[in-house]
A protein has these predicted regions:
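Short cysteine-rich clusters marking metal-coordination/redox-active sites
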Residues: 252-255, 280-283
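Short Cys/His-rich Zn2+-coordinating modules
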Residues: 230-242, 260-268
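Short linker/helix segments within small regulatory modules
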Residues: 265-277
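Divalent metal-dependent phosphate-bond-processing catalytic cores, especially two-metal-ion Mg2+/Mn2+ enzymes
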Residues: 1-14, 38-65, 76, 128-238, ...
Length: 297
């Protein structure tokens, strides 16, 4: 990736020379510690961070916010993902580790304290349903989701699936439901006007690709999945149901029997989560699907 040709890189390099390189080293060292690989090539997480930073820089300009601060929040937004050598551990919000790293690195770089405070607050409010809305966090939220959809987003889905050790079938079973659910509501999930203008096309492109992919998967491998849009009851007094789109097998992969599906939502560490259980009525084989539901509005 041609990092030094990015507008956000040139702007941050003028403001704090060497800062972007230090963030890069921190993220890539953490990812190599997780994967056990020592090659110097760009890691997936750094590549994604650069894409989100570039998009955040552009969105911030359109939204008349500080583009440098938005780019910094974006660069750090996934920096806590491999904390402790684990991928996306769910026992502690990774944004807390990201905020800690951001403060440490920005202070060492001599970045102004007011800017550090803005970055740390934005990171702590990002994907925290209980936190107050934050303009920088909103921009990075939108940029992050825009980067996950469209054709580059589809490519990243398969990279992440490989990183998690999934083959084609298990990637569809375990993770494609989240991609389909979020792609379907992408325009409504955007928090800034500038991002809403970009989201509709990315949503359509993503859904079109996955439908074609599932059709080809059936023809080439005999793996038959159906995309089903389902309404999931929510606990408590909330009348509105959650709508999800799942790629579900047409039949049990072990015996060809009928699959029974149980859907519910529950409160997770950072979000309201879908918990889907699949059980074959004939042989009893079980599978489960779990992911955070989109926050809309």
């Amino acid at each position: 990736m041609l990092l030094k040709q990015q507008d956000f890189y040139r702007s941050l390099a003028a403001r704090a020379p060497g800062l972007v390189e230090r963030v890069r080293r921190t993220i890539e060292e953490a990812e190599r510690g997780f994967t056990g690989k020592r090659e110097a090539r760009d890691g997936f997480l750094w590549e994604h961070s650069v894409l989100v930073a570039a998009q955040s820089f552009r969105l911030a300009k359109a939204e008349k916010e500080d583009p440098d601060l938005a780019a910094l929040v974006a660069l750090f937004h996934d920096s806590g993902k491999f904390a402790g050598g684990r991928y996306h551990a769910d026992d502690k919000p990774e944004e807390e580790e990201s905020a800690r790293l951001a403060r440490e690195i920005l202070e060492a770089a001599g970045f102004e304290m007011a800017g550090i405070g803005h970055v740390v607050r934005a990171l702590r409010s990002l994907y925290n349903s209980g936190a107050r809305r934050n303009r920088l966090a909103d921009i990075v939220h939108d940029a992050d989701f825009l980067a996950k959809f469209g054709y580059l987003g589809v490519a990243n889905f398969f990279v992440k699936s490989a990183l998690r050790g999934r083959n084609l079938e298990s990637a569809v079973m375990d993770f494609l439901g989240k991609e389909l659910t979020y792609a379907a509501v992408l325009p409504a999930n955007m928090r800034t006007a500038a991002a809403k203008k970009l989201a509709a096309k990315k949503s359509a492109d993503t859904l079109r690709f996955y439908r074609a992919y599932l059709a080809e998967l059936k023809d080439a491998h005999g793996l038959a999945f159906r995309i089903q849009t389902l309404a999931v009851p929510r606990p408590g007094s909330r009348a509105k149901k959650a709508t999800v789109s799942l790629a579900l097998p047409a039949a049990c992969g072990a015996c060809g029997g009928k699959l029974l599906t149980d859907l519910r939502t529950e409160k997770g560490l950072k979000c309201e989560k879908l918990e889907a259980s699949l059980r074959c009525g004939s042989c009893g084989e079980k599978r489960s699907i779990s992911f955070c539901l989109p926050e809309l509005g």
